[in-house]
Amino acid sequence: MFTKKINFKLQSSLELLITLSFGLALLLPIVIIAFIQVSNSNTSLTAIESQQAASKLSSVATLVGSEGSPARQLVQINVPPGVENIYVGNTMVSGVGHEIIFQIVSVINSSYITTYTPVNVSGDLGGIATQGTYLVNVSAQSQCQGNPNVQCVYMQPVV
């Protein structure tokens, strides 16, 4: 009789262990999917905030560029987390171009948020790639620093 009681206890413990294993096997993929969804939503939020900041810089650059030199304006932008670098103009050739690029790096991938301006833009905003709120001086110049033969709008952070 004593052995039957032990076998019954072992059997119920084994059944409980199997039931818990099935529960964990079902719960683990749900937890992993939830973490992936949270990561995707954070990346999407960073992309949207970067798009807003780039559009703000682009519209101010267009306004200042249409007024011509010596027009200037201070603009406040919010740099979201995950921004690796901010490129203004064409950094490969002469530093003067028509685009503002936010490079976003996340756990999943790296992406670029780009806005175009009808005026030539140049500048150095790579130093403000960390999360925070910054003031950027946007000024129209008759001779651009990257290429003195071209008029452009120059962007630099206010220190």
Label every PLM stretch briefly:
Residues K9-L10, E67:
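Histidine kinase transmitter module recognition
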Residues M1-K9:
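N-terminal leader/signal peptides at the extreme start of proteins
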Residues I32-V159:
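N-terminal export/assembly leader peptides and their processing motifs that target proteins to secretory
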Residues Q11-A25:
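N-terminal signal-anchor/signal peptide hydrophobic helix marking the start
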